[in-house]
Amino acid sequence: MGAYARASGVCARGCLDSAGPWTMSRALRPPLPPLCFFLLLLAAAGARAGGYETCPTVQPNMLNVHLLPHTHDDVGWLKTVDQYFYGIKNDIQHAGVQYILDSVISALLADPTRRFIYVEIAFFSRWWHQQTNATQEVVRDLVRQGRLEFANGGWVMNDEAATHYGAIVDQMTLGLRFLEDTFGNDGRPRVAWHIDPFGHSREQASLFAQMGFDGFFFGRLDYQDKWVRMQKLEMEQVWRASTSLKPPTADLFTGVLPNGYNPPRNLCWDVLCVDQPLVEDPRSPEYNAKELVDYFLNVATAQGRYYRTNHTVMTMGSDFQYENANMWFKNLDKLIRLVNAQQAKGSSVHVLYSTPACYLWELNKANLTWSVKHDDFFPYADGPHQFWTGYFSSRPALKRYERLSYNFLQVCNQLEALVGLAANVGPYGSGDSAPLNEAMAVLQHHDAVSGTSRQHVANDYARQLAAGWGPCEVLLSNALARLRGFKDHFTFCQQLNISICPLSQTAARFQVIVYNPLGRKVNWMVRLPVSEGVFVVKDPNGRTVPSDVVIFPSSDSQAHPPELLFSASLPALGFSTYSVAQVPRWKPQARAPQPIPRRSWSPALTIENEHIRATFDPDTGLLMEIMNMNQQLLLPVRQTFFWYNASIGDNESDQASGAYIFRPNQQKPLPVSRWAQIHLVKTPLVQEVHQNFSAWCSQVVRLYPGQRHLELEWSVGPIPVGDTWGKEVISRFDTPLETKGRFYTDSNGREILERRRDYRPTWKLNQTEPVAGNYYPVNTRIYITDGNMQLTVLTDRSQGGSSLRDGSLELMVHRRLLKDDGRGVSEPLMENGSGAWVRGRHLVLLDTAQAAAAGHRLLAEQEVLAPQVVLAPGGGAAYNLGAPPRTQFSGLRRDLPPSVHLLTLASWGPEMVLLRLEHQFAVGEDSGRNLSAPVTLNLRDLFSTFTITRLQETTLVANQLREAASRLKWTTNTGPTPHQTPYQLDPANITLEPMEIRTFLASVQWKEVDG
C-alpha cells in the first residue's frame, strides 16, 4: 500500500539471449543497455565475506547520508499479484514488477558504485525463473558484490496485526529458503525491513531476532510517538521483544526511517513522479543544480539532528518505482557527485549509495548505549482522527479462510513428512504442499489478510487459497491410503460451517476419518449434516459410541438440515476412523428445538455441564451469568451485539471510516436489538441456546459434555446499509469486574501484552478518538481480570478488540462501509456490493487469574490447529498389501507434554524434515500445574513412521546453523545482558524454556508402514 505514488503507464523489457533489443514505451526515454552487453564488462567477482565487508567507505568526521535506492512492490493491493508482476491493468495503477527488475539490473551494471535493495521474494522468485542462465549469473555477481542486497527476504512483507505467528514464520522461511538455495550466504538478509505495515507488533520483533536479523527498520508509527522520539533522539533503539526469553535472544535493534519509505520532497526522480530532474549545465535556462544541492544539504542536516550518530538514511524510491531505473540513478549519480564536491568548500556532508545493512553496520560501529523499548507500536495513527484500527477486522470472511488454510496446510505438511514420497506420488495422483504454502505466504502480505485490498484482489487471494487446497487434498488422500492400508474415495467437505456435505447428506453409510494435528490426544465433537433418520456410529474398535441427530432452528428462510453429532477420540498427530450407518425406523428420533416464549414470570434459562453453567435472562433472551462450577466462580456477564455508526467525514474532521481507518460517529454504539428470540436445544451430547437478534444477526451459545468453555457461534450479515449508515458490528461482554482501565491482548497469537485505556507506555497520549484510539489487534485472545477472576474470549480469526469501560470487553466481528477512507484503495468496504454473510465463533473461559493460562493456552492451540475431517463411502480396495487395514494411527510414540506445541513438521527434501517445537507458556503463567517450567524431550524415537539419523539445530527460519549463527551486539541502558550458555545438542535431551521455539533439520529414514 503506497503513501504517495499513484501511477500511469510504463513498459520495458530486456534482451534474453537473442530475443532482441530493449523496446521503448515512451518516445523520450533513453535506451537502456541490454543485459547481454554487460556480460563482458563485469568486474571479476570476488567472494563476498559473510556480513558487511562489501559496504562502502564512509567519512568519520562528516554527516554520512546513506541513499537507499529501493522499490516497494505490494504483493497485491489495487491489482492482483499477476497484474502487478506482468504490468496488466495499468489503467488501475501503473506497475509492472518484471520491468522494474529488468531495468534495475541493467542500471546496476552500468556503474559499479550503484546499489539497490529488493524485498518481495514472491515477485523476485517468479522473475528469476524466467531469466536465462547468463542473466542469473550476472545477478549472482551483483549479490556477491553487495550491490544488489535483499532486505527482509520473506515471500512478502507481512502484516503485523492480522497475522498468526506460525504463518509469519512459514512465509519468512519460504522466502529465505529461496535466497539460501539461490545465492547461498551471500543472499541472506541482515536487516528486517517493514516499511509499509500499519503498526508493529512485539512478537514480530521477537521472531525477527530469533530468525537471526541484526536490525529492523520500519516506516510507519504514530504521529505523536514520532514527534516525541525526534525530540528525545530515540528514533533508533533496542527493542526487547519478550518478557520470557532471556536477553539478547529477542532483542532487536530497531530504527524509524525519517520519511516513511519515500524520498524527501522534491527529490523523487521516477517516471511516476513530477519532481524536476537535476540540471547541471549553467547555460541551460532550466539550470537547478545549485538550488537542489543546497536544498539537499539543508534537508540532510535537518534530518540528521534527530539521530544520534553521524549517519542518516534517505529512502530513494517508493511504490513500484524504478521501472526506468536509469532515470533514478542518473539523477542520483549527479547528486552524489555535486554534493560531495561541496566538501572542498567546507561542507561536512558526505553522500553515498548504501543499503540498510551497511547503514546498520555504521550504527553498530558507533558503539553507543541505546535505550530499550518493551511494548509495541499499536495502534498507529497518522493524525488526530485517523487511527488505523479498522483493518484489524476488515474482510472477516477472508481472515477466517486464511486461518482455516493455515490449519489445513499444517495437516498437509505433517502427513507429507510422516509418509514421505508416498504422499506425493500415490493412487490419487501427484500431491503437493507447495501451492498452498505459497498461497498462504501471499496471504500474509500487509494488504491481503489485513483486508485492505480492492474487492477483485481479495477475490483473487481467495482463489489462490482454493487452488492450493486441491493438491493438498490429493496429498492427504495418498497419505491416508498409505497409512490406512486401503484406498477409498475421500471427500473433503469444505462447507461444513454452513452444514453442507453431499456425502453425509445422501449416503446410508459412510466412514469419518478425523486427523488431529496436535501433539497430544484430543476429544473432538464431530458435526455432520445428514438426512433425517437414526444413525449408529462405531469407533475404530467397532464399539458403538453415543450419537445424536438434532434438528436446529434456522435464522433465515432456508431449511437447516439435521446434524449428526458424536465425540471422536483422537490420538496425537494421528487419526481415528468412525463408521456411520443409518438404521431404518418408522419414526425418526431427531431432537427438535424448543422455542422459549418471552414471559416476565419465566424462570431463568440455563445450559450446563459438569464444568460450566450459563444462565440467560428470560425477559431479553440474553446471556446474563457464567459460573465455573469447579472453582465456584460466579460472574454476571451480559453479552449482546452493537454497531458503531461509521463516520463519513462530515463532522470536525473529514476522515471517514474505511478499510484501514476505524472512526465511529459517536462513542456510544447502538444495540442491534435489546432482546433476542430464543430456542433451546438439549440432548445428551449438546446444549444450545439459539438467539435471533435481527434478520441479519444471530448467535448460538453452546456447551458440549466435558467442555470447560462456552462457545458462542455468531452469524452476521449481510449488514444493511439502506439507511445510508455504514455499520461496524461488535460483540460486547459487560461484567462488574473492577479492571482499572486495563485489559490484555495477544501478540500474533503468542505472548500477552497489557493494554491501558487512553494510555501509551512511552509518551503522554493526547486521546482524540476515545473508541478507535483504544482498539488493538486480537489475533487469538483478549481478556479482562480483577486479579482474582479472569474472563477470556478466544477468537477464530484476527479481530479488533478493546475494553472501553471497566469490566467490559468487545470484539469487532464485521464491518460494512459506504465511504473510502482516503488511504489509496479508492473503494468503500462494501464486500461485493450486497455485503457478506459471515459466521464465526468466540470461546469464553471463566477462571481464576492464576489458573487461566492453562485453559486459554491449550484451547487457543486447539482452535488454530483443529482436527481435519475427511469422509469416505467405505468399502475401498486394499492398497498397502502386506499390512492389515488400520483404523487408528498416531505419528508419535508418546504424547508431547501439554506445555509443548509441535509448531512445524514438514518435508524439507529427500530424507529430511523440518521440525519446530515450541514451549507455549510464558514465564510465571501457570504455577498450579507447573506448565511454565522448562521441559525436556527425547527426540530420538519420538516419531512412529521414521527414525531420526541426524539432527541439526538452526535459527527459526532454518537458514543458519544455530552453532554458527551470530548477530551484532548492542549496548543498552539497562546494563549488560547475560552471557549465552555454551551450545550443546543432544537429541535425547532437548530442553525448551518458556516461550522458546527450537528449530531442527532432521535427516530421517522412513519405516515400512505396517499394522
From Swiss-Prot:
E.C. numbers: 3.2.1.24
Effect of residue 451 to C: In MANSA; reduced enzyme activity
Glycosylated residue positions: 133, 310, 367, 497, 645, 651, 692, 766, 832, 930, 989
GO CC term (a single one): extracellular space
Catalytic activity: Hydrolysis of terminal, non-reducing alpha-D-mannose residues in alpha-D-mannosides
Outcome, altering residue 202 to P: In MANSA; reduced enzyme activity
Keywords carried by this UniProt record: Disease variant, Disulfide bond, Glycoprotein, Glycosidase, Hydrolase, Lysosome, Metal-binding, Signal, Zinc, Zymogen
UniProt GO molecular function: alpha-mannosidase activity; carbohydrate binding; metal ion binding
Function in brief: Necessary for the catabolism of N-linked carbohydrates released during glycoprotein turnover. Cleaves all known types of alpha-mannosidic linkages.
Protein name, per record: Lysosomal alpha-mannosidase
